[in-house]
Amino acid sequence: KIYTRCELAAAMKRYGLDNYQGYSLGNWVCAARYESNYNTQATNRNSDGSTDYGILQINSRWWCNDGKTPGTRNLCHISCSALMGADIAPSVRCAKKIVSDGNGMNAWVAWRKHCKGTDVSKWIKDCKL
C-alpha cells in the first residue's frame, strides 16, 4: 500500500508514535517519506547482504527475519514480510523497539540526513489529526 502523507500521519498517531520517546509525529512521517516514499512494500538490499523492509525500512540483520540474512538477531521477533502489509501496526511496534534502543531515530539514516534538525511540523501540516 502507498499511503498519502496525511493518511500515514493519522495511522502513526493512532498507533501511538506521536511523541513516542520524545519524537513528534512529523519526525516519523518525514522518516517514512525518505525511507520508503510511504510505500509499505518497499525493500532495499544493503551491501552487507541484509535487506530493509517496509514503510520504515526495518533491517533484517537486527530486527526481523527474512530467512536469508545470515546471523539475524530478529530482535522484533517478526518475519520481515509482516512489515510489508497494508497495516503498519507491525512496523510501528518494531520501530518503537528500535527507537528505544539507545540511538533514538538516528537508527534511520534517512531521518539523520533529511529530517533531523529541520522543521518537521510541515510533514503533518493541513492533516486532520
Curated annotation (Swiss-Prot):
InterPro entries named among the record's database cross-references: Glyco_hydro_22 (IPR001916), Glyco_hydro_22_CS (IPR019799), Glyco_hydro_22_lys (IPR000974), Lysozyme-like_dom_sf (IPR023346)
GO CC terms: extracellular region
Cystines in this chain: 6-127, 30-115, 64-80, 76-94
Catalytic-site annotation from UniProt: 35, 52
Listed PROSITE patterns: GLYCOSYL_HYDROL_F22_1 (PS00128), GLYCOSYL_HYDROL_F22_2 (PS51348)
Protein localization: Secreted
Domain of life of the source: Eukaryota
Pfam family name, one: Lys
Any one GO biological process: defense response to Gram-negative bacterium
Quaternary structure and interacting proteins, as annotated: Monomer.
Family, similarity comment: Belongs to the glycosyl hydrolase 22 family.
PANTHER family named among the record's database cross-references: LYSOZYME C (PTHR11407:SF28)
Function: Lysozymes have primarily a bacteriolytic function; those in tissues and body fluids are associated with the monocyte-macrophage system and enhance the activity of immunoagents.
Name of the protein: Lysozyme C
Annotated organism of origin: Crax fasciolata
Primary gene name: LYZ
